[in-house]
């Protein structure tokens, strides 16, 4: 009887630990599938009170130049239509788990901004991922192809959503308040 009780108690103690490991980390999913064309994007319209569309464009232009400027000058600013288009890259955090390790990763995406009085719209689309694993495999895939239900794919999806949300949040702060000017104050 004591042995049976001991086995039952040990199983009860192990169960919460096993359930906690199966639980996926919570994060806000911002990259969603467009049902009309099947592609994935992060799109949002942000209301801005008391700032003209020209001023929003100017603030966004300065922020993009200071954060996404590259040697190939791939940023397109259209001052007549008040639009900005850019391709940008962010780096994924390395991670590992049982039987897998992401040794490096990059996410490329296209950023489009449009400005109107009282609001602006941004779209992050054409999301592509390049991931290198510890076994030597390097894969380049679109976000649509990162929908596998394994640990590396879950990590990559989480990283992409968190990084794009952080970019959108920082950009919103700069466009609304004109912040970010203290960056050169070293």
Give, region by region, the residue ranges found by the protein language model.
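Bacterial Sec-dependent N-terminal signal peptides
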Residues: 1-22
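Ser/Thr-rich, low-complexity intrinsically disordered terminal regions
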Residues: 20-186
């Amino acid at each position: 009887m004591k042995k049976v009780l001991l086995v039952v108690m040990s199983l009860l103690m192990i169960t919460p630990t096993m359930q906690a490991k199966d639980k996926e980390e919570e994060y806000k999913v911002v990259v969603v599938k467009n049902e009309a064309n099947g592609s994935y994007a992060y799109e949002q319209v942000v209301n801005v009170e008391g700032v003209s569309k020209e001023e929003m464009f100017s603030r966004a232009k300065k922020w993009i130049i200071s954060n996404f400027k590259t040697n190939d000058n791939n940023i397109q600013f259209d001052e007549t239509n008040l639009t900005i288009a850019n391709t940008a890259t962010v780096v994924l955090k390395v991670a590992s788990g049982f039987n897998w390790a992401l040794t490096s990763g990059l996410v490329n995406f296209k950023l489009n901004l449009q400005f109107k009085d009282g609001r602006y719209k941004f779209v992050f689309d054409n999301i592509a991922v390049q991931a290198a694993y510890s076994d030597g495999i390097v894969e380049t895939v679109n976000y649509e192809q990162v929908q596998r239900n394994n640990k590396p794919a879950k990590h990559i999806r989480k990283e992409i959503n968190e990084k794009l949300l952080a970019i959108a949040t920082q950009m919103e702060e700069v466009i609304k308040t004109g912040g970010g000017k203290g960056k050169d104050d070293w």
